[in-house]
């Protein structure tokens, strides 16, 4: 697999990154479970999924008895590793990491930072699930979070891995048993990945995924080039 994961669920049935994340969260968490987000407040669309104050949508994790806590980032926007050492414990079923800055101005995470978070999480709570919202992060570095300890990474084919060609879709990649649970959530228990028509989108998926590293590389080069120009104005 491209992300060095045991298994993956790649489907056009995922209508957005938020939908894919929702399936992953509900696939893994059960009533009474606790999740801890270690990268501050998630971006807006995920707040409704979690059921944060002011965004307590019908059907949220909170409504299903799944509790949420978070560790805020440091003033410079980087992870607070010391607070993670204090707060992470076996009571948390999931440690949630948002790799991208989302709609804020904090820096996105490097894979090496995710590796450090995963190491702390597994040391403090060996049975926890380390889940990474990998949207906008695919192919930005030579390795992915799944290479450095993340149990599950989630993203959208409309973004980096679709290469600008995939019109819809998302993916969940990680440990086999976790992916199976997500597949049961997407379709139904007992069926999982074994059902569902592709509806003619596979060509754009294959072409987009093939082109994705080149497209992302070009975007990175363009961003660096533009930044250099504007620095000199």
Predicted segments, located by residue:
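Conserved PLP-enzyme active-site core in the AAT-like
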Residues: 15-217, 221, 227-230
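A short linear hydrophobic-aromatic micro-motif
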Residues: 8-9, 156
